[in-house]
Each structure stands twice: as C-alpha cells, then as structure tokens.
Amino acid sequence: MSQSLIFDMDGTLFQTDKILELSLDDTFEQLRSLNKWHTVTPIDKYREIMGVPLPKVWETLLPEHSDEVREQTDAYFLERLVENIRIGKGALYPNVREVFSYLKENDCSIYIASNGLIEYLNAIVNYYDLDNWITETFSVQQIQTLYKADLVKTIIRKYNIKKAAIVGDRLSDINAARDNGLVSIGCNFDFARKDELSHADMVIDDLIELKTILPRLNK
C-alpha cells in the first residue's frame, strides 16, 4: 500500500519567521500611518498564536478594532507576505527538496494542509517550484470550518488515502492526525512547543530524518 505524507507549511517546510516580522512590521506601520495603531508591532504575541487561522490572529492582535479594520489589515498583511516571498525574502527549511525527491522516488505522495491562505501558499509553492513534488496544496480557506482535522479529512476523501502521516510543528497538526487515525510526526523547529510535541507519535529535529522514518511507516 502506497504511503502519503501530509505536510504543514508554516514552521514545517517554510521558514515563516524570515518574512513574518518584516510583513507584520509593514502592516502595523500602515496602521500607524492611518492612526489606527500607536505602539510597537506585537510580534511576540503573534509568535504565541502562530499557526491559527488569520481571522483568529486579528481578533487577538486587534481586539479593540472593528471587523472592517481587521479585514483591511488582513488583506494588507497578505499582500506584504506574498510580495516578500516573491522577492526572495523567505526560505525553505534545510533539506526540503532532498527529502521531497527521496519521497517521490519511493512512491510516496506529498500533500500540503495549511491554515495559510491560498494566495500565500501558491506564492511559496510557485517561488520554490514545489509542484515538482507536491500532488496538491490545500488551504483551510477551502473548507467551511477552520479546523485542520477537517482539511485533512478532505484530502483523505479526495485521494482515497488509506495510509498516511502528518508532518507538522504545532498541536493542530498532531490533533489532525489523531482525529483522522493517522501517524503524527512533530517537527521540533522554530515555532514548536515541547508540551505540544509530547503528543506526537514521533518527533524530528530535521526533515532529513524522514528518510529513515519512511521505511518504518511502510511496514
């Protein structure tokens, strides 16, 4: 039976922190110029909630602002993220391409399941030519709920997946695996938290470790 791996994007494949602070600063500078924000950019608070869907992000970072301002801020933030990706400010984590090549050579299907928006995800996939390996990229924007477990369920149904593991750095990835009866592989990377990773079936410190894990998953 062929194996599938479903990857998170932010903090798992893509080093979001390379463009995060830059884009968030751009966004809050815009708010300051409009007299809608009067203090420093709340980067630390954003890091705490990294990985949640963007509507929840703006509820947390802009609790006193109207929905209209949050929507405008969301749109501007997305513009800045995409532009910073397109001009090469971001980076993949080490060994992404090597691992993807290995997985494809070993008949493993690769999918992305992310809380990121479609335009943002497409910018990453296109800039780094990840479509050479990825079967399809899925965004939480494509489903009614904002739960990653439901997004993973969509992938499983569409491709009739019988055997898979989810690779990600946050509890939402681990829970998505558990709720769908899949193996969870936690990534101990930049945004990971030890208390969350403790719930994963296994934990890696580098994506290259997937080359040794894959044969075990196939047993």
Language-model segments: which ranges?
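Non-catalytic pre-domain segments flanking phosphatase-related domains
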Residues: 1-7, 163, 219
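Short, acidic loop-to-helix structural element flanking the phosphoryl-transfer center
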Residues: 83-112, 122, 149
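Surface-exposed amphipathic alpha-helices with a cationic face
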Residues: 97-104, 156, 174-178
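Conserved phosphate-coupling serine/threonine residues in phosphotransfer and NTP-handling enzymes
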Residues: 12, 114-116
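A short, structured active-site edge motif that brings together acidic residues
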Residues: 46, 130-146
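Acidic, Mg2+-coordinating phosphoryl-transfer loop and its flanking beta/alpha structural elements
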Residues: 166-202
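Conserved Lys-Pro-Asp/Glu-containing loop-to-beta segment of HAD-superfamily phosphomonoesterases
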Residues: 148-174
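N-terminal helical cap/lid subdomain that shapes the substrate entry/recognition surface
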Residues: 2-94
